């Protein structure tokens, strides 16, 4: 397997021979060219570029510079790719580095990123997870062990200038409705901390000022955080520029549906083994607007779940109309309160929901006024039985063990 992106984790992202970028822009030069049918390896930094350490303090999570993220490897060109084609990407393997057998999960401070449950957990915290082959455990969250579903949280092709302008316009219009909101409604372009691959000089400055942040998923894929995009899966990406420009990063060892902690998976450095192909004029042939994918046949299978429901009624008891966001939040909060009965802190429970292979489902979307969302927690990940019984829950978490907080 040929490695076409080779990184040095002891160096900063901007010291990697132009192989890293953290903005989306059509003018980014291809760092390598491959042919349809080629198989190759791409090494990736963790999404923060090494800002988070394997330690017992959350100060680095509190102070993380979010103008830097995400650091992506690429873009990689595919010979013959043209706008309107579909780029076929087979994820052959996802792996860890031998000298980096750990990852991290964090709750961001409300003033610096926040997250899905930031009003309930506004302070920064962190958990470290150690890798044992396909399994992971944490010194900060005892009594759980689960098989990872390693995947890229972020992968996609470069946008065209027209698509980039569309993104910036629609997200700018949204920000304008509440420009002082904390956390913000969206992340507008900023040249601060921009790393523009192999662009240089005035061209790099111009692209940095208008390049799209990598934070959200968009029409091209991007930061979708889909845990099922693991080895054995296939993705069909719309192509918007000549050669396609495939970039990837934000690798996860394991993640729950929704990535509710925002820094919401077990984040890691590692590698992707990729095979690429093309379907000429595939966007028109299949009417594809956003990427579509086929899941892997080899993901871990759990047989028994505790499933928590949530409806469109918020924490204050106010009724909302078919609001899936509120319903999923309520399902998560219900699960957190349940796990606390076994001795987990709220932060430990949130970390479990963000890192374990939990399933999130929209179970009902038509029965007015309530949507119903469900959160499925596999019971087999725990070293004890979490199912209800007549004796009631018992405290199973050793005293004094918790997530890392700030000092």
Swiss-Prot record:
UniProt keyword terms in alphabetical order: Hydrolase
Keyword Hydrolase: yes
Catalytic reaction list: formamide + H2O = formate + NH4(+)
Gene Ontology molecular function: formamidase activity
Any Pfam family: FmdA_AmdA
UniProt-listed Enzyme Commission number(s): 3.5.1.49
Enzyme class label: hydrolase
Family the entry assigns: Belongs to the acetamidase/formamidase family.
Reported function: Hydrolyzes formamide with the production of ammonia which can be used as a source of nitrogen for growth. Also acts, more slowly, on acetamide, propanamide and butanamide.
Assembly and interaction partners: Homotrimer.
Protein name: Formamidase
Primary gene name: fmdA
């Amino acid at each position: 397997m040929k490695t076409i992106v080779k990184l040095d984790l002891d160096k900063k992202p901007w010291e990697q021979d132009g192989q890293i970028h953290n903005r989306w822009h059509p003018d980014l030069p291809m760092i390598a060219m491959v042919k349809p049918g080629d198989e190759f390896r791409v090494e990736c930094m963790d999404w923060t570029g090494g800002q988070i350490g394997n330690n017992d303090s959350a100060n680095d999570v509190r102070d993380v510079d979010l103008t830097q993220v995400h650091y992506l490897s690429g873009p990689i060109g595919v010979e013959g790719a043209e706008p309107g084609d579909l780029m076929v990407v087979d994820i052959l393997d996802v792996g860890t580095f031998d000298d980096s057998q750990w990852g991290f999960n964090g709750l961001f401070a409300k003033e610096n990123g926040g997250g899905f449950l930031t009003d309930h957990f506004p302070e920064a915290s962190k958990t470290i997870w150690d890798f044992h082959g396909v399994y992971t455990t944490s010194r900060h969250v005892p009594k759980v062990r689960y098989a990872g579903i390693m995947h890229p949280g972020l992968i996609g092709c470069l946008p065209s200038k027209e698509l980039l302008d569309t993104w910036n316009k629609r997200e700018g219009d949204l920000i304008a409705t509440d420009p002082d909101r904390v956390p913000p409604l969206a992340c507008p372009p900023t040249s601060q901390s921009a790393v523009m691959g192999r662009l240089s000089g005035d061209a790099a400055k111009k692209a940095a000022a208008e390049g799209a942040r990598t934070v959200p998923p968009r029409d091209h894929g991007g930061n979708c955080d889909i845990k099922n995009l693991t080895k054995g899966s296939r993705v069909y990406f719309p192509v918007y520029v000549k050669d396609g420009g495939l970039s990837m990063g934000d690798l996860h060892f394991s993640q729950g549906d929704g990535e509710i902690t925002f820094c919401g998976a077990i984040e890691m450095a590692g590698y992707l083994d990729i095979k690429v192909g093309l379907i000429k004029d595939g966007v028109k042939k299949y009417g594809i607007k956003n990427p579509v994918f086929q899941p892997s046949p080899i993901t871990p299978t759990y047989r028994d779940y505790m499933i928590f429901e949530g409806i469109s009624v918020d924490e204050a008891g106010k009724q909302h109309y078919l609001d899936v966001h509120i319903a999923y939040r309520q399902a998560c909060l219900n699960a957190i309160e349940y796990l606390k009965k076994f001795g987990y802190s709220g932060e430990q429970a949130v970390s479990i929901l963000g890192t374990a292979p939990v399933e999130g489902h929209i179970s009902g979307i038509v029965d007015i006024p309530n949507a119903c969302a469900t959160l499925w927690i596999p019971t087999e990940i725990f070293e004890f039985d979490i199912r209800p019984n007549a004796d009631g829950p018992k405290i199973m978490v050793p005293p004094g063990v918790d997530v890392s907080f700030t000092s």
